[in-house]
Structures are given as structure tokens and as C-alpha cells.
UniProtKB/Swiss-Prot annotation:
Native source organism of the sequence: Macaca fascicularis (Crab-eating macaque)
Post-translational modification (record): Acetylation is enhanced after treatment either with trichostin A (TCA) or with nicotinamide (NAM) with the appearance of tri- and tetraacetylations. Glucose also increases acetylation.
Subunit structure of this chain's protein: Homodimer.
Mitochondrion found in the keyword field: yes
Protein name, as recorded: Malate dehydrogenase, mitochondrial
Active site: 200 (proton acceptor)
GO molecular function, a single term: L-malate dehydrogenase (NAD+) activity
PROSITE patterns tied to this protein: MDH
Record InterPro entries: L-lactate/malate_DH, Lactate/malate_DH_C, Lactate/malate_DH_N, Lactate_DH/Glyco_Ohase_4_C, Malate_DH_AS, Malate_DH_type1, NAD(P)-bd_dom_sf
Activity: how regulated: Enzyme activity is enhanced by acetylation.
Length: 338
């Protein structure tokens, strides 16, 4: 069933460049001057789905906004600088995307980013909860396994929590899985769809190759190697960039893909499915990524995990302790805030 619903990976991105799409979304990017924020803002500006694009950061946003505003697409772009301008940036937004935070450097795990990024995400989440609680919130800032629980707890503190509208963007894991499977099988990656469930770090990233469309088969040793490559693909990029950052361009692409899918669903398009790290009852973890049917109000239905072989079952049970610890770390962090 999942395979039937899940559309080819890049359909949303391709459609965003067509002229027939509905096109009134007001999108805010918080952290718009950074390595992910700039290319993400470019992709959003290039889409006819977006009518207004507001960019926030603590530096350089007027310049980024001025640069993007010269592009001959209809999205109106405005930059906002510093905390006092954040409420205006959020005003009337339908979708808020948060790539803000520091990137990984060689030798760092996503969890090493926790201390810096937890504070940044909590601060931005509080502003969203106060000034635009109705918006869809898409968190890119790592570690997503902790920053989503942080966002949820901050929204609870403000009495405006809606679990159907807070998304951890794990789309890059799906994009990578699609690409790597396509490479191995000589397929068009735009026609491959691999659900990736669990979390968004190391062994919590669980690609369900058994549910890939089209159906693919690998011998166990190749399957193990492929799974490992998907799980460590972020580290592959960090190493290749040799200290000059982490995955920014592919992450911007994946973030845009998720936003376009969400906006399509908000516009009433049916059958839009994306995986995302959200509040969940699918496993004993309180947050878990699975394929979600998206709708006008966010998550319409959690499609769950479905039938999987023992190899994938074991990956889930191996991931749960680490995932629980990351979730607890995020929740505990919010308890320390005033």
C-alpha cells in the first residue's frame, strides 16, 4: 500500500517548476544566510508555489534577500535581521523552515551539535509558538532526533502544541537512498522511492529497501553495505568537504522537496506521501519517522511501517535505545529553560 501511495521522489520538485500549480504559499526561512539557508531560499524563490518568502537570520539577510529579489519569479522576498525583527518575519506565514544552526565538521557527530543548536532551535521555536503557532514547522537543524522533541516541548509550554504540524525533515535520507539504489541498479533515480524510517542520525536511519518501488533485490552483503552507506552518507560529505562544512546543497534540495510536498497537500492535492520525524505511536519511541499522508492541516494519516523482513526489524530494535536517549535529551533540555 505504501508503495502505491508513494510517488516518485522528485515529482514534487519537478511540479514546483511547472506553471499549473497553486501558488499562494507564504514561507519563512529561519537561518536563511547559512550554508543550507541560501540554496534552500533560492529553490523556494524559484517555485511558483511560493508567493511570499521571508528570510531571517542574525547576519547578512538584507543582502541575501536583495540578491534573491532580482530573480524573475513572482515570490516577493524580504529579509529580516536580528531577534527584534523575527515577529514580523513570521507574520502570516503558512510554512516555517528552520535550517539555522552550526554545521558538522570532520570528527563530529550530529549529536556534538546539540549544545549550540538546541539553544538556537528552542529560541526560534518559542518565537514561532508566540507569533505564528498555526504555521507548519519544518525543522532541518540537527540533531533532528533531539530538535523535534525540543520544538514540541516549547510549543507545549506556550499551550499551542499541534503534533500534526511539526516535522523533522529527514527527506535527505530518502533522496540518498533513492540515488544509491538507482546507481546500483542502473535506474532513473527520479523513478525510485525508498521509504526511510526511524530517526536522522547513524543507525537510527533505517532504509526499507524491501519496500522500494520499483522492487529491487540485493544479496545480503550488498544490502548491508548499501544500508551502511545511506546511514553514513552525511559523514561521507563532511569528510569530502575537509572541514569546509557539511551537506548543504543536497540538504537544501531535500528541504525544498519536503516543503513543496507539504504545500501541495495544503493546496488540496491528494495522495502526497513523505517520510518525516514526527510524534508517533508506531513504536515505543514517542517520535519516529514513517511515511505520512499529508493533508490540508498537516499530517492526515501516519501510514506506519508495514510488513518488513527480519533484517529491517532488527535495525528498528537496534535503533530504539539510541533514539529514546536522543528524544529524552531534547525534552530534558527544555526543562532547564526558564
Amino acid at each position: 500500500m505504501l508503495s502505491a501511495l508513494a510517488r516518485p521522489a522528485s515529482a514534487a520538485l519537478r511540479r514546483s517548476f511547472s506553471t499549473s500549480a497553486q501558488n499562494n504559499a507564504k514561507v519563512a526561512v529561519l537561518g536563511a544566510s547559512g550554508g543550507i539557508g541560501q540554496p534552500l531560499s533560492l529553490l523556494l524563490k524559484n517555485s511558483p508555489l511560493v508567493s511570499r518568502l521571508t528570510l531571517y537570520d542574525i547576519a547578512h539577510t538584507p543582502g541575501v534577500a536583495a540578491d534573491l529579489s532580482h530573480i524573475e519569479t513572482k515570490a516577493v522576498v524580504k529579509g529580516y535581521l536580528g531577534p527584534e525583527q523575527l515577529p514580523d518575519c513570521l507574520k502570516g506565514c503558512d510554512v516555517v523552515v528552520i535550517p539555522a544552526g552550526v554545521p558538522r565538521k570532520p570528527g563530529m557527530t550530529r549529536d556534538d551539535l546539540f549544545n549550540t543548536n538546541a539553544t538556537i532551535v528552542a529560541t526560534l521555536a518559542a518565537a514561532c509558538a508566540q507569533h505564528r503557532p498555526e504555521a507548519m514547522i519544518c525543522i532541518i537543524a540537527n540533531p533532528v532526533n533531539s530538535t523535534i522533541p525540543i520544538t514540541a516541548e516549547v510549543f507545549k509550554k506556550h499551550g499551542v502544541y499541534n503534533p500534526s504540524k511539526i516535522f523533522g525533515v529527514t527527506t535527505l535520507d530518502i533522496v540518498r537512498a533513492n540515488t544509491f539504489v538507482a546507481e546500483l541498479k542502473g535506474l532513473d533515480p527520479a523513478r525510485v522511492n525508498v521509504p526511510v524510517i526511524g530517526g536522522h542520525a547513524g543507525k537510527t536511519i533505517i532504509p526499507l529497501i524491501s519496500q522500494c518501488t520499483p522492487k529491487v533485490d540485493f544479496p545480503q552483503d550488498q544490502l548491508t553495505a548499501l544500508t551502511g552507506r545511506i546511514q553514513e552518507a552525511g559523514t561521507e560529505v563532511v569528510k569530502a568537504k575537509a572541514g569546509a562544512g557539511s551537506a548543504t546543497l543536497s540538504m537544501a534540495y531535500a528541504g525544498a522537496r519536503f516543503v513543496f510536498s507539504l504545500v501541495d497537500a495544503m493546496n488540496g492535492k491528494e495522495g502526497v506521501v513523505e517520510c518525516s520525524f514526527v510524534k508517533s505511536q508506531e513504536t515505543e519511541c514517542t517520535y519516529f519517522s514513517t511515511p505520512l499522508l499529508l493533508g490540508k492541516k498537516g499530517i492526515e494519516k501516519n501510514l506506519g511501517i508495514g510488513q518488513i523482513p527480519s533484517f529491517e526489524e532488527k535495525m528498528i530494535s537496534d535503533a530504539i535505545p539510541e533514539l529514546k536517549a536522543s528524544i529524552k535529551k531534547g525534552e530534558d533540555f527544555v526543562k532547564t529553560l526558564k
